[in-house]
């Protein structure tokens, strides 16, 4: 599948808390070209991995009665959704994609994601460990595009946002000859760049 459009929670004027607004403001003061996290293979995780508009990087969905697995070419990432409605285990460690469980509401797959890892360093995407994400997936038939998956998002994160925020994505079926390949992106480059950028700022202030 490939993405046809996406609207991320951070678009427009996000309802940031004062603490999150400070982190966002620090990032916005940097060079938007040189300080783009994607240049440093920053793995954003959920919900942004599902909201990417990188049309040249396809994804694959594998579905069984008990699981839905999604494999993304972009950054070689994947996520697993357990279709059992059970909450995340208490001993689960936070991760960039969190722990996702789902139930069916007629023809709509309702996914709840918790156990998300903190992202409170400078970047366009901020998230705390208190974040909870709800997705609603629905397959529709478009006269021109064919099979589409429409996805509505809502993220609740009291550390980052003052109210729930929403996003939307539409995936369309890729051509039969499209293959999900490897991206091969080095890790930890962005965090090193953040440290270097902060050091430059401190040196310039002296």
Functional labels for PLM-detected ranges:
Residues 1-206:
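PEST-like low-complexity, intrinsically disordered acidic/proline/serine-rich tracts
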